[in-house]
Amino acid sequence: VRLISNTGSDRVLDELKQITEGTSLSVASASFSLFAYASLRESLGALREAQLIVSSDAPTEQLLGEDADRSLRNQLIAKWLARDCLSFLLKIAQIAELSQSLFQSVLVLRDANNQPTTALSGDCSFTTAGLGITPKAGFSLIQVAESALEASALDRWFTQTWSQLSTTVPKGLLANALATIAADAPAFELYPRMLMHLLSGGDELLDEDQIINAATGIRETAVW
């Protein structure tokens, strides 16, 4: 096996861009991010099929990325991405949910003859950090198979795990979460949601002594 630094041109993303027409992709990932999907969207269009194993206890907020994905969220394309991703999954993918947590991820590419050509394992979840697009906090270990024997071993692990699970498309937590993000929110809900976000955790700001000093009638201020 070879270790991947997941920086520069030695990233999981670069390995997955080897997708060609007729390739299949199998993913077992602790997390799934819309922005990881966006980074591979064009390549994924060439897949003939995809299999995805996700943890059923993964928080749905992970779909919108982590702190490092703030600039991507600010592009305000999450709703469109959710629709596109859901359409892609319903069209060619099968999804299975694992009741336990996944502590490492496995990604396997197979050619048109269904032979594994690329296989990765380790801290390579289907997120921007896992693909090497954004920095990842802490240390991680990602391995890529360098021989057909090594790739076949990871492929067998995925196949055995998959055979023990039941597929959930078109239903399932991931599909439902994507549908929720993609749905149009009623206009009358936006204003109270904004107020709740702005005022949450700010009870002390409405305290009388914070607004005006009860003893003097003057609020102490500072000019910088």
Residue ranges and their predicted role:
Residues 1-222:
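PLD/PLD-like phosphodiesterase catalytic module centered on the HKD motif
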